[in-house]
Amino acid sequence: MKLGYVELADDPRYANRGARSGIVFTDLGRPYQGSQVALEDARAIGRVTGIEFSMERSASKSGDELMQRISDWITSDDIHFVLADLPARALRDLARGLAEHPIMLFNVSAPDDSLRGADCANNVLHTYPSEAMLSDALTQYLVAKGWLQILVLQGPAPEDAAMVASLQRSARKFHAKTVETRPFLLTNDPRNREQTSIALLTGGLRYDVVYVADSSGEFGRYVTYETSLPRPVVGSAGLVPTAWSWSWDRDAAVQLQHRYEKLSPPRRMNGADWAAWAAVKAVTQAVMRSGSIAFDAVKAFLLSDKLTLDTVKGNPGSFRAWDHQLRAPVLLSTADAVIERAPLPQYLHQTNVLDTLGIDAPETACRF
């Protein structure tokens, strides 16, 4: 059973934007090592069952190269399940280009809601949480704490706007309120002081919490302790919703973290690593429990309610039929501690409590 793994060689998401100052604003590690931890488990199982698990990795400069590589894998190497560490547009185009091929792609790093909505594809499964899941998890916690009035500081990037749009949807869903959205800039120009000074950005109104939408990681690190009012900071800084935190210490998480660090020193496991790990674990379970390595049989099991993936976060995971998003808890963490695990117990659902996070079936814009 051979799997594939594709990525862009010059993926801008992994560019070191703080290279001049020597400061790393975001985690630059690619999630490939997460898949290797799960592959070690698969190989151990394979030695008992007689199934050999392996993985081919390809880094290309363009989506067209990736599409050709996967097409070659399908015909020459019998590879039909491929982990994709790609930005949203590249993943969308790849899925469309391979629509007529026997292939299932696993999105292990793109949170964009559009990939689970208008741009969804029947040949993509999402193990990385959607933006909607992340914002729902955080908003559940804010409402539970009684922090209903949210001041939003929004950065200039499209990713920042997407985060804010998702937060606003979550606020409506859980009856919180964004009292105002104020744009900030990353500049030293004194003429833009009102958009660079945290004291000015957070002054002149009342709020319970400050939400920072800063995909760059450069501005948000300064907001905590600099707000005009003494208020908690959440979003891209402070309390952050994430698929994984190295400080999660329940549900056998410590063992997983130690195995990852042994394989990939000195990095610690991040959310995309977890998503890559989960993708390989899902395929392994589907192969073992379906008793087959045939594409149709493994795909059918992955999409069935028989899949009970150990997420190492408590609740077992499965893929939603309406948008192929993996159901999984979301961790709310600081730099060195997990404060809460969502969904919170007071939020209920008629079929699965994990569906309180993200887009539920009646809301979906996905049409396969």
Predicted regions located by residue number:
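Extracytosolic ligand-binding ectodomains
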Residues: M1-F368
